[in-house]
């Protein structure tokens, strides 16, 4: 008789917050796309009446802001969790990796805050 084959538990990729950081940055860019997009195009030399149509994302801005803040919260929670929550062989247990993720988190958080606040200071540029 043959023994039934035991399936090994599948190892999942270690969760380290990269996805949440990316989602937060993308949502912040989308939240400010209605206001930042025309200014960037004008600064690059593009012009025309069609630039006024780029405000189509304005009604969705609160949703994108909420998504950016939620993603940043989950990234912060994942990155700043205690080292004891990491198993010894995982990437998050390595101090250099943890320091790099913290640095990247604060850079992304600053960029998110700048892009979220940009629509409020944009009138000073026109």
Curated annotation (Swiss-Prot):
One function term, GO molecular function aspect: metal ion binding
Membrane-topology descriptor: Multi-pass membrane protein
Gene Ontology, cellular component aspect: plasma membrane
Membrane-spanning segments: 26-46, 54-74, 104-124
Keyword Repeat: no
Signal peptide: none
Main location: membrane
Alphabetical keyword list: Cell inner membrane, Cell membrane, Membrane, Mercuric resistance, Mercury, Metal-binding, Plasmid, Transmembrane, Transmembrane helix, Transport
Subcellular location: Cell inner membrane
Binding site for Hg(2+): 34-35, 86, 92
One Pfam family named in its UniProt record: MerT
Cited function: Involved in mercury resistance. Probably transfers a mercuric ion from the periplasmic Hg(2+)-binding protein MerP to the cytoplasmic mercuric reductase MerA.
Entry's family note: Belongs to the MerT family.
Protein's name according to its UniProt entry: Mercuric transport protein MerT
Phylogenetic lineage: Bacteria, Pseudomonadati, Pseudomonadota, Gammaproteobacteria, Enterobacterales
Gene: merT
